[in-house]
């Protein structure tokens, strides 16, 4: 497959940031946007799912990286990098936690940075987002237009459920039935409480990213904790930059240290999640937290 999937010039070794939703990947992408060599693209899900939109979940493996699909993805990212006048791609899409094997097949030399955050913090933040409805109305039209423009017409119907649910949530002011990465089996959770759904979602997504990443060479995948990034931004970013084989950037470091969130927010869930909620989510979060090195 490697021979068939020859990569184009500026996407030879893209930097792909993976991390579950509400893990700090948007902020980290804004940090790397300060690097003069990088063209950063946030959440072009429709590029990664091109040709695979009828899948029942967001999981893609090397078997899904058919030559014409891989070629389209590389060409689309190549055009983006060139349009920005940069030399290298930096990309982040939360559902790519479930596509690491696919990414490695499309970009064999990709540098995959996995940003891991405590599942309780993710749960706390995602709960707020699920209630809020996310996008401002004026952004919905442009997002849907961009998505459909980048999708083959025969795959347009595959996007309808997500469009319908988003519009319904906005019009009725009711929470979305589901939001974020869709691991295998996600449909089976919908009859359960939103707390259980969010807990299972984080555990399944984080564990698959860790498992798939650990099967790659250490030169292709590296995992970093969000908590370390916040407490020691310079040290953690230096390690990321070295792993990605980027040149140093004072502008990047200055932006990170001036915009980093207060350390006090990292365990905010302790004050905001009551005992009942903690008891509900613990059976679903604790095994994954323990496996990933967190204490309950």
What are these regions (language model features)?
Residues 22-23, 45-47, 95-97, 118-122, ...:
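Short, solvent-exposed loop/turn segments at secondary-structure junctions
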Residues 40, 112, 221-223:
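Conserved beta-strand scaffold positions in the cores of enzyme catalytic domains, especially
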């Amino acid at each position: 497959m490697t021979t068939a999937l020859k990569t184009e010039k500026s996407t030879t070794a893209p930097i792909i940031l993976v991390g579950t939703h509400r893990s700090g990947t948007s902020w980290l992408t804004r940090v790397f946007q300060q690097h003069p060599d990088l063209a950063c693209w946030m959440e072009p899900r429709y590029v990664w799912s091109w040709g695979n939109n009828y899948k029942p979940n967001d999981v893609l493996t090397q078997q899904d990286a058919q030559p014409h699909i891989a070629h389209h993805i590389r060409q689309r990212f190549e055009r983006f990098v060139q349009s920005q006048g940069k030399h290298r791609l930096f990309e982040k899409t939360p559902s790519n936690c479930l596509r690491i094997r696919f990414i490695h097949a499309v970009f064999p030399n990709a540098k995959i940075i996995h940003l891991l955050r405590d599942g309780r913090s993710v749960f706390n933040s995602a709960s707020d987002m699920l209630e809020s409805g996310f996008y401002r109305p004026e952004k919905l039209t442009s997002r849907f237009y961009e998505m459909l423009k980048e999708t083959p017409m025969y795959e347009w119907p595959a996007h309808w459920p997500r469009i319908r649910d988003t519009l319904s949530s906005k019009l009725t002011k009711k929470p979305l039935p589901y939001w974020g990465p869709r691991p295998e089996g996600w449909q089976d959770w919908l009859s359960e409480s939103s707390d259980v759904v969010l807990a299972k979602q984080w555990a399944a997504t984080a564990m698959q990213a860790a498992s798939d990443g650990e099967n790659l060479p250490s030169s292709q995948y590296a995992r970093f904790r969000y908590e370390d990034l916040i407490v020691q931004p310079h040290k953690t970013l230096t390690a990321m930059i070295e792993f990605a084989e980027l040149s140093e950037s004072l502008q990047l470091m200055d932006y990170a240290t001036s915009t980093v969130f207060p350390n006090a927010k990292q365990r905010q869930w302790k004050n905001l999640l009551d005992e009942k909620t903690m008891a509900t989510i613990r059976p679903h979060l604790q095994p994954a937290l323990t496996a990933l090195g967190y204490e309950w």
